[in-house]
Structure formats: C-alpha cells, structure tokens
Amino acid sequence: MTIDFRNVNTLWASILVETLHRLGLTTAVICPGSRSTPLTIAFANHSNIEAIPILDERSASFFALGIAKKSGLPVVLVCTSGTAGANFYPAVIEAKESHVPLLILTADRPPELRHCHAGQTIDQVKLYGNYPNWQTEIAVPSAEEGMINYLRQTLIYAWERSLFPARGVVHLNLPFREPLAPIPNSDTEKIQFNFDVENFFTEINLLNFPSSNRIEKYEKIIPKWQLFQRGIIIAGVDHSYNPQEYCRAIARLSEFLKYPVLGEALSPVRNYAALNPYLISTYDLILRNSSLAENLKPDIVIQIGELPTSKELRTWLDITQPPRWIIDNKGENLDALHGKTIHLRTSIEQLANSLSFKETISNSPYLKLWCDTEKKVRKTIDQTLESIDSLLEGKIAWLLSQTLPENTPIFIANSMSVRNAEFFWQPNNFKYIPYFNRGANGIDGTLSTALGIAHHHQSSVMLTGDLALLHDNNGFLINKKFRGHLTIILVNNDGGGIFEMLPIAQFDPYFEDFFATPQTVNFGKLCLAYGIDHYLIQDWQQLKQLLNPLPETGIRVLELNTNRKLDAEWLKTNLSKFSLT
C-alpha cells in the first residue's frame, strides 16, 4: 500500500489502515458520515481489506459481529461523530459477553470543538463504559515522526487487547480536524521526504501474541474425579473454532471417567454424536420426571463453559448442589448458581490431552441409567414428532437437525427458537456449526449477525421468530453488499411465543398487547420491498425440499405460520410426558 501524504489526516488514516492490515485485518464495516472521511477513504483504498459500507449503525455492528464470530479475528467498525457510535452499543455488549473481537473506530471532533455546541458532538470518551477490553482516545493527527510511531504502537496494543487475554471489544476514539477530504497541503512534505515505508512496518506481521491457554498439570485433580461414579459432564453453550477437536476432547474425558455428557443444542457435541457414546440430548425432558431427577442426582459435575439454556437443568443443579468443576480459560465467573464450584483456567482440549488411560473403568449403573433413559425418551420424541403433520413450531428444529446439508452453519435466534432447539435438536453426525448471540441473550441484530456469519462463507441458515426478525429488518439493506447465501427459517406465530410459557400469559388484558406484542406484518410484502425471495411453507415436505440442497447466493425467507397459543399448550402438555415412558 502507498501511504497517502496529501495531508496530515490522510497520512494518519493510511498509516492506521496499513498497520491493521499487517496485523491481520481483512474486513472493515463502514457507516457513512463526514467526520470519519479520512478513515473511510483509507479503508476503501486498501486493496487487501474488504471495506463494506452499511447505512444503519446497529445493523452494521452486528454484521461485523457475525463476521468476527466466524473468523475469530477482529473486524473494524467505523462511524462518524455524535450519536452514530451509540448505535454500536448493543453489539458491543454482546461482543463482550460472548468474547467476539471487534475494533471500534469512532471519529470525533477535536478537543477545541467539544462542550461548546459545535454540532454533532457528544462525549465519546469511554462511550461504552466497562464493556471494552481496552479503550483510549487517539491523539489528533500529526505529521511528526514520534507521533506516527505512537500511532503504530498503540494500534499494535489495541489489536492484542482485542484477542488477549480473552477476545472482546477495543474502542479507539479518533479526533480529526478539517480538512476531512483528501485535499493536498504542505503539512506532510518533511516526513514524506524521509519516510521509509518498509522499515516503518517491518516485523509488525511477525508479532506473536501470548496464548490464552496456560499449560497446567492435573495429576492431583483427575484422581479426585475418578473417586466418584455418579458424575456428569455438562457441555454448555459454546462456539469452538475447531469443533471436531473440541468434541473429541469432551468424548475423551467422558470415556476416561465413564460420565455421561449432557450436551446443549448450542454446543457442537450434538452434531458430532458418533464421537460420544454417552451423549445425553434429552436431559431437560428427563429432569421433568421427579423420580428420575432424584435417582440421577450426581455426586460431581464437570461443567465445560457456560451452563446450557435449560431452566430445568439449572433448577436441578441448584437444588442438589453437587460440587462443580468449571472448565473455562477466559477467566470469568461462570457460576450463576453460586454453588460449590472450582474454576479450572484451561481449555477442555488441554485437559483431555493430559489424560493417560492406564486402567479401564467399568461402566457404572448410574451411567447405564442415564443412557437407557436417553434412548427411551429420544425414541418417544422422535416418534411423536414424526407423526405430526401440522406446522408445529417445536418440530422445526427437530427437522432441521436431520435435513440440512453437512457442515451447514446455522444461526439460532433467542427466545423460543433456542429453546425448541434445546428440547428437540436430534443428535446427528452432520457436523452442523451452531452460531448464536447468547452473551446477553437479546434479539438485537439477529438478521445482521446471521448475514455476517454467512458473508463469504458456505450457504448458511437462520432459525428465528417473527419479532426477532422484525427487530432487525434493516439488516435486509445489507443485501446488495452480501456475498454468499442465507436461508431464513421464519417461525411466524404473530408475537412473542416465549411469553406464552411464562406466568404472565394468564393475565389479560395486559398480556397480548404488552408482552406477546403481535405485529401482524405481511412478510411477503416486506421481503418484496427489500428485494428478498419469500416462500410461504405449506407442509413439511415442501420445507425439506427447499433445505437440501441450499442455494449458493442471495437471501430468502421460508415462512411457516404457526399458532402461538396452541404450540405453547402442546409444549406444556408434552414436555413432561416425554420422560414418563
């Protein structure tokens, strides 16, 4: 890249962009605005960085979040001064809570134009509170050699902090004085004459950042676990960048200890079922049977990452209070139950690699009870759902788990979508890759995140309800810049189905207007306005035919109209019955 010496702003911005490129940046999502002009031009001019313009800042931030979820590397977000950066806030929160690396560059007016009603100016310093891993205000652009060196080194540190010790957000506030456009002047003549580009950027791309995994010995820990036959492993919400290795590690620990693995639908373990002979997918339903819940009380729990979505599981653990060992290498407190816990600051992969199979432990009656119960409940669920011809919301996740092409990335929205997956997602060997926004568990940015995941990726799928999609329908504006394919499975039950499962559903007249909040939107017309293909699904066979194979390009919506109240009644009636076999 040629450094742009036309003026001090173009110099500053082009050095910033080239430094980030050398560190590994490939994508920048840019929202329109005047104060960010130097940054916009520098990113747009760089041949090795994809600069994607997106109008809506909230949508843009979740789109960037999706791209970063997929790659595990920082994505840059650029916006102008004023309230523009505030629209990034929900995505900043989600990125922090789910450990996604984002590098946010908010352009700002210089210090002399603040606190004096200069226009489009707010206090942007520490705009995102305590959510960033690191945040600072960069100096006003300067053509002095020492300041250019400062910029480079600050960017190196910012990049590192977005990845270590845990992935997350870094916010850089960047003030610019006019001229904002690349109007030539003589301010940069001196440094241009002496500037050695290659020497300035030498070895930036060779930097090795410290690993977030520490090597520890477990000789004293593993024998403690082996003392207990009544133990379980819980594989919670997780997005691994190497899902097969992650699942193999869990299976290795499970076979070493002869413990069943309670596998969350948002963990890859259900999609690599052959690796783990002791996989339990129906634990939420099993634990609704009070007799089984009592007989299956564990003496020890090994929790990998966060707890699953299941409220039944959480309540059971809270009541029984077994000692829990939590495997987590991000340094967080993952004990929302405030039980007797010990955190192991390592990864499951490292832990599994430390195991040595010196002697074989025989299967316990406790393990057999879990596995036998799983087979019975699984069979009942599968037979029940197979026999249902009407468009039942709960059947959709079950069908997807058997129908999508192998290795399909699937983004599962919050509220009822994630819970139906938890209840009914069938163990399989199709290596599906689950994605989700379970950091803060909101419905913000659902569509935009899914588009970010699918961008330049293989054909992907999103499972969502109508309210989550409507909350982010501006994401459809990304269509013209989107490269790839996304199929949206839209469960349209005209409102928030999850509230039908809560006690508030009994309280009219408040419930329908203030909680269920039906929007009565014609999604066919909405899709037409955005230029999106729309299909109204009439039966299961039509849905299956449209899901495999998936198209290679474009966005389409497959809408299933379901009955919110009848589906809720079906769940309330059947969830407990499944474990009574």
From Swiss-Prot:
Entry's transmembrane regions: none
Entry cofactors: Mg(2+); Mn(2+); thiamine diphosphate
Signal peptide region: none
Cofactor: record remark: Binds 1 thiamine pyrophosphate per subunit.
One GO-annotated biological process of the protein: menaquinone biosynthetic process
Function: Catalyzes the thiamine diphosphate-dependent decarboxylation of 2-oxoglutarate and the subsequent addition of the resulting succinic semialdehyde-thiamine pyrophosphate anion to isochorismate to yield 2-succinyl-5-enolpyruvyl-6-hydroxy-3-cyclohexene-1-carboxylate (SEPHCHC).
HAMAP family listed in its UniProt record: MenD
Protein name, per record: 2-succinyl-5-enolpyruvyl-6-hydroxy-3-cyclohexene-1-carboxylate synthase
Species name: Gloeothece citriformis (strain PCC 7424) (Cyanothece sp. (strain PCC 7424))
Gene behind this protein: menD
